[in-house]
Amino acid sequence: NASFLALPIFIAASNTNESFALLEFIGIGIWASALIFESVADFQKLLFLRNMKKAKKYNQVCNIGLWKYCRHPNYFAEWMVWNGIIIMAIPSFLNLGALEISFLNSELSTILWGFVGFGMLYASRMMYVTLVYTTGAVPSEHFSALKREGYKDYQRSTNRFFPGPKKVN
């Protein structure tokens, strides 16, 4: 649901403090690094596809650059973009909990605050499930394994989502 994904952004934007908290700097750093990581992965894939097209080599496995370390570095980076936003929103979320909401009693305010916190964490989980299982990695890999010779070997030797060293078989 789009409202869960937007929740951390709305919370971060609600911050009334004039200075940044450490977690906001960390979140911004993660967000910016992940955005660069995603752009590099997408650019590497684009160059790979262009080079394969020029060489008339179709249905090849992209295992260059960041694609050596995981099969979907662009999806991983997209997920980290959202986690950076969530981390950036934590100080604002904690400030919301400290505010007294005059039109709500304290018990209802606490429950609402709990739901908002759960929603922020759920946004990360929801994005992960979407990128890996619903629309991303798993569906695309099914077709890649069918049409790309060597893709099953790539699957056996390379992490799906989280970047890391080659797997030892």
Locations of the language-model features?
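Hydrophobic transmembrane alpha-helices
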Residues: 1-5, 9-44, 53-169
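Membrane-interface helix/loop boundary segments of multi-pass membrane proteins
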Residues: 47-49
